[in-house]
């Protein structure tokens, strides 16, 4: 589903406008501290800009003119996978992945069915009964990806998805991401040009608060 983003956030010096076509993956690159993660937070609904609008498939999710429109994060069908996995320590892997659909109102059984399907898709079904502290960095990142997919988002936002993975595991995860993103609308923040080429259809550059 296509995504259209336009907003300004003076505190971060951002004046942003870009579009992502249906089924397209776009990489977002720029210097450290330039605001790449902030852009994802605005799109996900975790941060309200000073002004702007956001459309997903022609449906307005944010329009800050006049009385304003702002759809909360849980109703946007947009999922953000943060740079750190942030798995819930008191839940095992299966219930971490099932947490999203369960919170959205799916039954316990349906949430777990969806979680198992996503664990299988990311090659992590064997970790279903482990806790977060029992996973390596690469395993945690794969589980976080499964959790993001279990929410069945229309747009997937990935913030440096390979940053927490060692060199040995990064190639496997890169190949997995490339395969999963083939049929999804996504925005991937990455500092690595190789990751951008492997994962994205095109690359946007953030410079001095604007997309180039």
Describe every region a protein language model picked out.
Residues 133, 151, 182:
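Conserved signature/switch motifs of ABC ATPase nucleotide-binding domains
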Residues 156-160:
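Catalytic Walker B motif of ABC-type/P-loop ATPase nucleotide-binding domains
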Residues 170-182:
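Helical segment within the ABC ATPase nucleotide-binding domain
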Residues 59-64, 109-127, 178:
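Conserved ABC ATPase "signature" region
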Residues 183-190:
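Conserved H-loop
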Residues 131-135, 139-141:
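Conserved ABC ATPase signature
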Residues 61-79, 103, 108-109:
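ABC ATPase NBD coupling module
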